[in-house]
């Protein structure tokens, strides 16, 4: 009996990651440094100087005639036209991909303007198209924030799934003494985790396997998404890992109300079926009724006593996203009294999604270890978690000091006060 065997098909899904603009290029470099494998990296930018330092295998200069390699000048419209000028080159680079990740920092010129164009090209070629982008810091200005909002809305129209990470929330978890460059590099690191957490599901086979077809079913035409990674150890390791995966202070959406959720549990040789089931149940409870759970498991002998839970939730309702990022009119005093950092302990030099925790609302001073259940009094089914971003609180509201003088003081001339 003769069997025909398609060698090309046996190679698995072709995954390409495109870093657009400065932020996307930095994320690509971070992925290469961290040893992300099984994907092809492409860097696309209008700035030739930035492209000269990229570690991507494929480099594309966007709009060479329009920008002459000098960048987009912070104008998304220039970035868009540059991508359209280079559409043929982009199409050739993306062609043949089963899945395309588009990663960018929104708010600038190249990433904000070119990312939606690249997403349209990828989608037209039939690739599963996923956007992983960051929203800018509030201190970068309202204009940049508005550009980011417009760019994200345009990108959402052309991708199957969109994962948004809020840079501003880094301010809530980093130590005040953290150097600026180090804090900014952590935003690139989170972009890397967003991509790697999904690609690992496809490229790393497991005992209960999740393949590209499963990922495509979960992510095709699903809109807003959440991706989280949690690592736990000890007796409550699966509970700890699942909780950390569900909630990250950097993500703008919550798992509540998601349509489909991939849960991948990775552990050492001591990983049990009960633990995999428990992780699935925790995620199921947090997502609510009607969610479709896709469970996968894999063995990594190097993990020993640890368990890693990866969660990819899609189909998050838009009204819940809007609830998280909706404008809130609050005074400077109220803002200082109500907004507390997600972590009150020091900033780890390399922030990892797996190290995030969701704290109770009683505003603890320090995160103390406990021997009790990892759940504590935490309610998986609470209505929602509101994470504020600088895109919703104006710089005046955030930093303007409240005026405490009484009217008599204001009406008294200075020379009378000094008598």
Swiss-Prot record:
<keyword id="KW-0342">GTP-binding</keyword>
<feature type="binding site">
    <location>
        <position position="188"/>
    </location>
    <ligand>
        <name>GTP</name>
    </ligand>
</feature>
<dbReference type="GO" id="GO:0043093">
    <property type="term" value="P:FtsZ-dependent cytokinesis"/>
</dbReference>
<dbReference type="InterPro" id="IPR003008">
    <property type="entry name" value="Tubulin_FtsZ_GTPase"/>
</dbReference>
<dbReference type="InterPro" id="IPR020805">
    <property type="entry name" value="Cell_div_FtsZ_CS"/>
</dbReference>
<protein>
    <recommendedName>
        <fullName>Cell division protein FtsZ</fullName>
    </recommendedName>
</protein>
<dbReference type="GO" id="GO:0000917">
    <property type="term" value="P:division septum assembly"/>
</dbReference>
<dbReference type="InterPro" id="IPR008280">
    <property type="entry name" value="Tub_FtsZ_C"/>
</dbReference>
<dbReference type="InterPro" id="IPR024757">
    <property type="entry name" value="FtsZ_C"/>
</dbReference>
<feature type="region of interest" description="Disordered">
    <location>
        <begin position="397"/>
        <end position="419"/>
    </location>
</feature>
<comment type="subunit">
    <text>Homodimer. Polymerizes to form a dynamic ring structure in a strictly GTP-dependent manner. Interacts directly with several other division proteins. Interacts with CcrZ; the interaction is direct.</text>
</comment>
<dbReference type="Pfam" id="PF12327">
    <property type="entry name" value="FtsZ_C"/>
</dbReference>
<dbReference type="InterPro" id="IPR036525">
    <property type="entry name" value="Tubulin/FtsZ_GTPase_sf"/>
</dbReference>
<feature type="binding site">
    <location>
        <position position="140"/>
    </location>
    <ligand>
        <name>GTP</name>
    </ligand>
</feature>
<dbReference type="InterPro" id="IPR037103">
    <property type="entry name" value="Tubulin/FtsZ-like_C"/>
</dbReference>
<keyword id="KW-0132">Cell division</keyword>
<comment type="function">
    <text>Essential cell division protein that forms a contractile ring structure (Z ring) at the future cell division site. The regulation of the ring assembly controls the timing and the location of cell division. One of the functions of the FtsZ ring is to recruit other cell division proteins to the septum to produce a new cell wall between the dividing cells. Binds GTP and shows GTPase activity.</text>
</comment>
<dbReference type="GO" id="GO:0003924">
    <property type="term" value="F:GTPase activity"/>
</dbReference>
<dbReference type="GO" id="GO:0051301">
    <property type="term" value="P:cell division"/>
</dbReference>
<dbReference type="GO" id="GO:0005525">
    <property type="term" value="F:GTP binding"/>
</dbReference>
<keyword id="KW-0963">Cytoplasm</keyword>
<dbReference type="Pfam" id="PF00091">
    <property type="entry name" value="Tubulin"/>
</dbReference>
<comment type="similarity">
    <text>Belongs to the FtsZ family.</text>
</comment>
<dbReference type="GO" id="GO:0032153">
    <property type="term" value="C:cell division site"/>
</dbReference>
<dbReference type="InterPro" id="IPR000158">
    <property type="entry name" value="Cell_div_FtsZ"/>
</dbReference>
<feature type="binding site">
    <location>
        <position position="144"/>
    </location>
    <ligand>
        <name>GTP</name>
    </ligand>
</feature>
<keyword id="KW-0131">Cell cycle</keyword>
<keyword id="KW-0547">Nucleotide-binding</keyword>
<keyword id="KW-0717">Septation</keyword>
<dbReference type="GO" id="GO:0005737">
    <property type="term" value="C:cytoplasm"/>
</dbReference>
<feature type="binding site">
    <location>
        <begin position="22"/>
        <end position="26"/>
    </location>
    <ligand>
        <name>GTP</name>
    </ligand>
</feature>
<dbReference type="InterPro" id="IPR045061">
    <property type="entry name" value="FtsZ/CetZ"/>
</dbReference>
<dbReference type="GO" id="GO:0051258">
    <property type="term" value="P:protein polymerization"/>
</dbReference>
<dbReference type="InterPro" id="IPR018316">
    <property type="entry name" value="Tubulin/FtsZ_2-layer-sand-dom"/>
</dbReference>
<feature type="binding site">
    <location>
        <begin position="109"/>
        <end position="111"/>
    </location>
    <ligand>
        <name>GTP</name>
    </ligand>
</feature>
């Amino acid at each position: 009996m003769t069997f025909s065997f398609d060698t090309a098909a046996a190679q698995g899904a072709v995954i390409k990651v495109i870093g657009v603009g400065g932020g996307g290029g930095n994320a690509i470099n971070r992925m290469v440094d961290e040893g992300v494998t099984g994907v092809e990296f492409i860097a696309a930018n209008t700035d030739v100087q930035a492209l000269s330092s990229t570690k991507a295998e494929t480099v594309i200069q966007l709009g060479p005639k329009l920008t002459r390699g000098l960048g987009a000048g912070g104008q998304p419209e220039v970035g868009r036209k540059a991508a359209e000028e280079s559409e043929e080159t982009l199409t050739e680079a993306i062609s043949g991909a089963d899945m395309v990740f588009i990663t960018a920092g929104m708010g600038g010129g190249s990433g904000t303007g070119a990312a939606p164009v690249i997403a349209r090209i990828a989608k037209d070629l039939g690739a599963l198209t996923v956007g992983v982008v960051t929203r800018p810091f509030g201190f970068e200005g309202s204009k940049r924030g508005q550009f980011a909002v417009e760019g994200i809305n345009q990108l959402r129209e052309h991708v199957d799934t969109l994962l948004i990470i809020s840079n501003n929330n880094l301010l809530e978890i980093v130590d005040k003494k953290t150097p600026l460059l180090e804090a900014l590099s952590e935003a690139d690191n989170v972009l890397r985790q967003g991509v790697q957490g999904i690609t690992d599901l496809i490229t790393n086979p497991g005992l209960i396997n999740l393949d590209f077809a499963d990922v495509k079913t979960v992510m095709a035409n699903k809109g807003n998404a959440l991706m989280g990674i949690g690592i736990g150890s000890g007796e409550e390791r699966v509970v700890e890992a699942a909780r950390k995966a569900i909630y990250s202070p950097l993500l703008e959406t919550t798992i509540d109300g998601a349509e489909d959720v991939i849960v991948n549990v990775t552990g050492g040789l001591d990983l049990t079926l009960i633990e995999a089931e428990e992780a699935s149940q925790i995620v199921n409870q947090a997502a609510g009724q009607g969610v479709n759970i896709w469970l996968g498991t894999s063995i990594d002998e190097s993990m020993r006593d640890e368990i890693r839970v990866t969660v990819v939730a899609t189909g998050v309702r838009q009204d819940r996203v809007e609830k998280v990022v909706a404008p809130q009119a609050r005074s400077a005093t109220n803002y200082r009294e109500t907004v507390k950092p997600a972590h009150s302990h020091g900033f780890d030099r390399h922030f990892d999604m797996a190290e995030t925790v969701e704290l109770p609302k009683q505003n603890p001073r320090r995160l103390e270890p406990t021997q009790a259940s990892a759940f504590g009094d935490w309610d998986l089914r609470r209505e929602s978690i509101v994470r504020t971003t600088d895109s919703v609180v104006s710089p005046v509201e955030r930093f303007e000091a409240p005026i405490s003088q009484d009217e008599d003081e204001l009406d008294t001339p200075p020379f009378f006060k000094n008598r």
